[in-house]
Swiss-Prot record:
Signal sequence, start to end: 1-18
Subcellular location field: Periplasm
Assembly with partners or alone: The complex is composed of two ATP-binding proteins (ThiQ), two transmembrane proteins (ThiP) and a solute-binding protein (ThiB).
Binding locations of thiamine: 59-60, 161-162, 197, 215-218
Protein name, entry field: Thiamine-binding periplasmic protein
Domain of life: Bacteria
Organism: Salmonella typhimurium (strain LT2 / SGSC1412 / ATCC 700720)
GO cellular component, one term: outer membrane-bounded periplasmic space
Role summary: Part of the ABC transporter complex ThiBPQ involved in thiamine import. Is also involved in thiamine pyrophosphate transport.
PROSITE patterns reported in the protein's UniProt record: SBP_BACTERIAL_1
Amino acid sequence: MLKKYLPLLLLCAAPAFAKPVLTVYTYDSFAADWGPGPAVKKAFEADCNCELKLVALEDGVSLLNRLRMEGKNSKADVVLGLDNNLLEAATQTKLFAKSGVANEAVKVPGGWKNDTFVPFDYGYFAFVYDKSKLKNPPKSLKELVESDQKWRVIYQDPRTSTPGLGLLLWMRKVYGDNAPQAWQKLAAKTVTVTKGWSEAYGLFLKGESDLVLSYTTSPAYHIIEEKKDNYAAANFSEGHYLQVEVAARTVASKQPELAEKFLKFMVSPAFQNAIPTGNWMYPVADVALPAGFESLAKPATTLEFTPQQVAAQRQAWISEWQRAVSR
């Protein structure tokens, strides 16, 4: 009789022995085979006795848009890939819980004070070009926009992409209220505006543009992985806009303790060592940078709006951009 019911008993008991699943929403290049995602997944799963499930979306702004749409019904335990420019907008959703991670655990330019969002890397937006093809790159954002040179440019949409939003804010920092006219001039040189970074950079590598919006650290990938030194980031005299990428756990998480454990793991060497040669950004912890990073130019001037300024103006500036580029 016992034999008859044994399979049923085992079936009923199976969920009790199943590993908990931590669902992390992130952007596509983080979760890609060539991104830091696989190494992070392996390291965390070895430590947590759980399954780490990475759900990839196109880019950082898309993460916030998705979470807003899902609200408290979201399956995300952690959202990884928002940034300093989305902090206030993300806070206003009331969909994120306090991290449990001390601010002293991270090191970013200007310091960090936030008990909800935890940085995992940082970098500076820049336009990347191929030195073998473009001999005289622009030396400033104004030169890129205003020069008679017929440079072909690709950048990302500020409505879906954090680099795209970064360029929107960079243009505002440099041009102020004259940004609409600057956008119109840049539109004449723009090949396309993509939803996310991966698509834009892929098109650039295929020769579709002379310059692509990316990061000052992007050339490190080509130096280290491909042994090529022909890619460079144009150093702009006005300075470069800072991006600090962050993660946070959700209020709706069914695994709050595991989510907090992940955020603490995120600032540990096991995670941070995957950042320089996985996400090609600067780590927020004291880990050694690989050879190749020392040749990268660091901006003399760092540009940044406060999260509150961005939240107050973002929609108006996006509308301004839309009107300007559609003329």
